[in-house]
């Protein structure tokens, strides 16, 4: 299965690296030349062309900052038709994603930083028009990255706040316990 990871930052790299390790054929997109070299150095196939990556993919991960989602989806809209798009962009609603890519199969997710070691809690909300088969394919892929849990999208913003902060709070508690003896 071919998977495009649009955005080669920390989260995009973690998604790409872990899926590649699991045997998926990955292409990552990144605009910054120094970051492209870093991603290539760790063995990932990289391009700066989002449309090319989307065209070659069966599934597309959107791993860009929320402010960049609109531009990316407008750019790849035609190449993403009838494909599963998994967005990890915080605070970007399913309705917004569906409006930008109406012919794609959208899943909104929120992983946490434990994604780096494939141990993330991953909340996900599929678009209501997704088939059970599409959801199962996405869950299989998300399972490589951690533990996926389907939630109602109305809870996603709260989960985003908790999921993003929980590892930091646990690290703070662990550090305090270490100093306390």
Predicted regions span which residues?
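A structural micro-motif
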Residues: 1, 24, 44, 83-84, ...
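NAD(P)+-binding Rossmann beta1-loop-alpha1 motif at the extreme N-terminus of oxidoreductases
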Residues: 1-48, 52-55, 119-120
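Hydrophobic packing within well-folded, soluble alpha/beta domains
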Residues: 3-5, 60, 86, 138
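Rossmann-like NAD(P)(H) cofactor-binding subdomain of soluble oxidoreductases
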Residues: 15, 42, 50-55, 59-124, ...
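Internal alpha-helical scaffold of NAD(P)-dependent oxidoreductase catalytic cores
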Residues: 99-105, 121-159, 169-181
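A general structural signal for well-ordered alpha-helical segments in protein cores
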Residues: 12, 32, 36, 57, ...
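Class I S-adenosyl-L-methionine
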Residues: 20, 37-40, 77, 98, ...
């Amino acid at each position: 299965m071919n998977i495009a990871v649009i955005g080669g930052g920390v989260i995009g790299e973690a998604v790409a690296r872990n899926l590649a390790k699991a045997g998926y054929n990955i292409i990552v997109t990144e605009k910054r030349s120094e970051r492209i070299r870093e991603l290539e150095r760790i063995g990932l196939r990289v391009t700066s062309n989002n449309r090319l990556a989307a065209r070659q993919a069966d599934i597309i991960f959107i791993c860009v900052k929320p402010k960049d989602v609109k531009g990316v989806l407008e750019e790849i809209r035609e190449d993403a038709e009838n494909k599963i798009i998994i967005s990890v962009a915080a605070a970007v609603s399913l309705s917004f994603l569906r409006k930008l890519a109406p012919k794609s199969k959208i899943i909104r997710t929120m992983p946490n930083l434990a994604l780096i070691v494939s141990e993330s809690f991953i909340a996900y909300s599929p678009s209501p028009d997704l088939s059970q088969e599409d959801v199962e394919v996405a869950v299989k892929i998300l399972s490589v990255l951690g533990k996926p849990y389907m939630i109602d999208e109305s809870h996603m913003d709260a989960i985003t706040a908790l999921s993003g902060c929980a590892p930091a709070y646990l690290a703070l508690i662990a550090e305090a316990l270490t100093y306390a003896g």
